[in-house]
Amino acid sequence: MLGIAIPAHNEEEHIAAAVAAAMAAGRHAALGGEACEVVVALDACTDATGVLARAAGARTVEVDARNVGVARALAAQALVQAGARWLAFTDADTRVAPDWLADQLALDADAVCGCVGVDDWSCHGLDAERLHAHFLATYNDRDDHRHIHGANLGVSTALYLKVGGFKHLACSEDVDLVQALERSGARIAWSARPRVVTSARRQARAVGGFADALLQALAAPAGVVAAAAA
């Protein structure tokens, strides 16, 4: 069995699309019919995230922590208890490609760190073009990158348990896990092959996360970003 884990805090705008994409990835023909479950960890949600996630086909678990490390760990625990041999992680504002899970497994590694793409920068209004240019100029979207994104991460259950899983960190829980995997000697594929598209939202949910990095880029002087994109 395979598992896909998604943490969510008040994500009613994005969760249906995120779960639908994850469900499609779990049904990909290259998986040979192996069962796949999608679990959404509802973290202090006060909106319709849970209803929408279940309607799209996910199982939900609940916690009141406002902590992404806790939420990821809870979703992973539910999948481990269900018998998942591989844990794939993404985010509630992210749509994985139909072959995303199959591509993770095809890399034949203990863990997979993937890249992210953005297909809509319009939420940044007049800054959209400048931010997009900065992303294209500075983001390394190729094999052997060293990005760590909770939105595009996979690990064998055996190695996940060996290193103790996600710590209950409010940010950088994904970085902490990958560093633990590196120390354990795990075979990690730093690959651009498994694809996801994430949002460029204006309100960062975690310090040090992808949205936070975008906001820091916006705070840089326009000339600095323009020079980087030249």
Where are the regions that the model predicts?
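A conserved acidic beta->alpha catalytic loop
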Residues: V39-V51, T94
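Acidic donor-binding/catalytic loop of UDP-sugar-dependent glycosyltransferases
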Residues: A48, T90-A106
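Conserved donor NDP-sugar-binding/catalytic core segment of glycosyltransferases
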Residues: D99-L126
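Short, flexible, basic/aromatic active-site loop/helix in glycosyltransferases
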Residues: G114-C115, D127-R146, L218
